[in-house]
């Protein structure tokens, strides 16, 4: 069996074959780029002389993500099941387990066409497709757990390399107290370009639904804007917001936008290059400066 990087454990592959049913065997496997909290492999399955592909997402046991992943697998399984029959290009669940004896936590899914695409020929069209897809997601009548912020407001402070500490302090003071959202909807919760698949400049899939929930739409918009800012610029992030507002017919609440943007911190300079993995140029030193620009613009919209 050909190998690429970390091999899935034998007992996990045995679970895959058992889940797929009689006559199925894993012929090949390849680890896919990305996956900060999990390991993702594309599996080639042989059955009755034919080959098909599926995707295996699994987590190492006893990692720092152990508590989270035991909740993430059933959550994503439930959400993907609810998405079946909708027009959102999400994977379909083949099987899932949290049983460590079977190699869990693990999630076996259908493979969607396409791959992560960070350097489009037409960025405007790229952003438009992202905004249109998010509008469609937010329009879904799908239930989910209530939104919980990733921010610990007590720990917020300007990044060590901040050149505009005043902007950070203003933003932190703004979100010091909770604010009720003006509207709520179904959220992907980690909507950004690393969780989108593209083929021939067309958005073909949205993956990683483990944090899906119900909350303010700005949570998704702001998180995507954060990721666009650190990789590209505040201008690109603002253009995404403008397209989303035009497509959805709703104005993005700047308070919730700022709250989402404040998820940026020093660790982004460490993990973002790992996520990008050479697929796009990245100015690491300029990340905080770009975030200051997008935060200042968001604050001006209040």
What residue spans do the PLM features occupy?
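Glycine-rich, phosphate-binding/catalytic loops in enzymes
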Residues: 125-126, 205, 222-224
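Helical subdomain adjoining the active site within ATP-dependent kinase catalytic cores
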Residues: 270-302
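Start-of-helix signal in alpha-solenoid helical-repeat scaffolds, especially tetratricopeptide repeats
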Residues: 73, 258-259
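Active-site activation/catalytic loop segments of kinase-like enzymes and analogous catalytic loops
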Residues: 218-250, 261-279
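ATP-binding pocket architecture of kinase catalytic cores
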Residues: 29-150, 166, 181
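An alpha-helical support segment within catalytic cores of ATP-dependent transferases
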Residues: 8-24, 135-189, 199-200, 290-302
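Short, surface-exposed acidic
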Residues: 21-28, 248-257
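Active-site acidic catalytic loop and adjacent metal/ATP-binding pocket
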Residues: 33, 37-45, 55-56, 93, ...
């Amino acid at each position: 069996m050909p190998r690429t990087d970390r091999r899935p454990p034998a007992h996990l592959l045995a679970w895959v074959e058992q889940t797929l049913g009689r006559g199925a065997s894993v012929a090949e496997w390849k680890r896919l780029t990305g996956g900060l909290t999990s390991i993702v492999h594309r599996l080639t399955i042989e059955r009755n002389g034919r080959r098909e592909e599926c995707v295996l997402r699994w987590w190492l046991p006893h990692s720092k993500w152990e508590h989270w992943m035991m909740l993430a697998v059933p959550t994503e399984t439930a959400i993907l099941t609810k998405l079946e029959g909708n027009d959102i290009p999400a994977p379909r669940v083949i099987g899932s387990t949290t049983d460590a004896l079977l190699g869990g936590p693990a999630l076996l899914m259908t493979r969607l066409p396409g791959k992560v695409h960070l350097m489009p020929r037409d960025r405007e069209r790229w952003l438009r497709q992202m905004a249109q897809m998010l509008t469609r997601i937010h329009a879904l009548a799908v239930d989910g757990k209530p939104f919980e912020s990733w921010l610990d407001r007590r720990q917020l402070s300007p990044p060590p390399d901040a050149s505009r500490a005043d902007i950070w302090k203003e933003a932190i003071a703004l979100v010091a107290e909770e604010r009720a959202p003006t509207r709520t909807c179904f959220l992907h919760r980690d909507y950004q370009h690393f969780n989108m698949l593209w083929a021939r400049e067309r958005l073909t899939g949205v993956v990683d639904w483990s944090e899906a929930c119900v909350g303010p739409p700005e949570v998704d918009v702001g998180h995507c804007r954060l990721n666009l800012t650190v990789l590209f610029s505040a201008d690109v992030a603002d253009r995404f917001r403008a397209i989303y507002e035009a497509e959805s017919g709703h104005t993005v609440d700047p308070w919730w936008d700022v709250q989402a943007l404040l998820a940026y911190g020093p660790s982004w300079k460490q993990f973002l290059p790992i996520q990008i993995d050479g697929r796009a140029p990245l100015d690491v030193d300029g990340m905080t400066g770009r975030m200051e620009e997008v935060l200042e613009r968001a604050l001006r919209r209040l």
